[in-house]
Design a protein with these regions (language model features):
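Generic ordered-secondary-structure signal
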Residues: 39-42, 61, 81-84, 91, ...
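Extended alpha-helical scaffolding segments
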Residues: 54, 169, 173, 182-275
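N-terminal alpha-helical scaffold/docking segments in eukaryotic complex subunits
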Residues: 1-87, 98-99, 245-295
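Amphipathic alpha-helical repeat scaffolds
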Residues: 17, 32, 47, 51, ...
């Protein structure tokens, strides 16, 4: 995300001051109207401008930021301008906790972001990894270790992986073993999920993260990541096989790590079960039961 300036325009800046003083209604209306929602593109420039002003104001903005994060779907319905309010709150929370080293604020921020990572409103969920990455850019490996408490949930695990893959967080991660532990935990969560979980949006979000983030990790840490993907390839779960296949096809890797991607592909190929041999079918196994009696 590019560097942004604060809120512009007399109406917005005046409404922001009123909101800080405990009168947020006018700010909520202005932000909602300029949100771009309902629509396909959220006004992230405006959300970032709000976050910048919250950072500039410091601790005095925290009450408003947390209030906006806590707006539920009744007060801020999904797919409406109202959904933009918690989006702004989440982004501002990430900015504020990144700029203020207060442990209490960071602990509270992580608790709020953990809860919102599984919010019913998908735009709120989508901004959580961005907020986490802001925090990760200053916390580094400490946050990677904190994510051990995130990888026991589908949406939370997806948010943690996506945050670590962000370009402002990944370069400051030095503990490759901790990162790979989070990747292993996320993979195990998906692998050990009941079959019915495949219909759950959280499972799909985690599988999507497993398909997209390992390539970024591999560009940072190289062969150790490929070693783990080789083990992940040994599965018959179609969603996880597709995730590994997406890793192999990643344009980030095909030229620089051609031999390693081929190694993962060979592991995938080797894990394909042999085709069923019809000559081994036992006579009388087919056609039994009530349907046969009705022929």
């Amino acid at each position: 995300m590019t560097t942004a300036e604060g809120l512009r325009g007399d109406a917005l800046t005046s409404a922001f001051k009123d909101a800080i003083a405990g009168r947020p209604d006018r700010l909520y209306v202005l932000l909602s109207n300029a949100s771009g929602l309902p629509g396909t593109r959220v006004n992230m420039v405006l959300a970032q401008a709000f976050a910048v002003d919250c950072v500039a104001l410091g601790k005095a903005s925290d009450r408003l930021v947390i209030e906006m994060c806590n707006l539920d779907a009744e007060r801020a319905p999904g797919d409406s301008g109202g959904e933009f309010l918690p989006v702004c709150g989440v982004l501002a929370l990430g900015f504020r906790s990144a700029h203020d080293p207060n442990p209490a604020l960071r602990k509270k921020a992580l608790l709020i972001l953990h809860a919102l990572s599984e919010d019913f409103r998908f735009r709120v969920r989508e901004v959580v990894p961005i907020a986490l990455a802001r925090l990760g850019a200053v916390m580094g490996d400490v946050l990677v270790h904190e994510f051990a408490s995130w990888t026991d949930g589908f949406f939370q695990g997806a948010a943690a992986l996506q945050a670590m893959a962000q370009p402002n967080f990944l370069p400051v991660i030095d503990d490759v073993e901790a990162l790979l532990a989070r990747l292993d935990e996320s993979y195990a969560l998906a692998k050990n999920a009941p079959r019915s979980a495949s219909r759950y949006p959280g499972f799909k979000a985690l599988v999507d993260a497993l398909a997209t983030t390992p390539a970024a990790f591999a560009t940072r840490f190289g062969i150790p990541v490929f070693d783990h993907l080789v083990t992940y390839a040994n599965t018959q779960i179609k969603e996880l096989r597709a995730a590994v296949e997406a890793f192999v096809r990643s344009p980030k890797l095909t030229s620089r790590y051609a031999d390693e991607t081929k190694r993962v592909q060979r592991a995938l190929d080797a894990s394909v079960p042999p085709p069923r041999d019809p000559t081994l079918a036992v006579k009388g196994m087919r056609g039994r039961g009530k349907k046969r009696d009705r022929r």
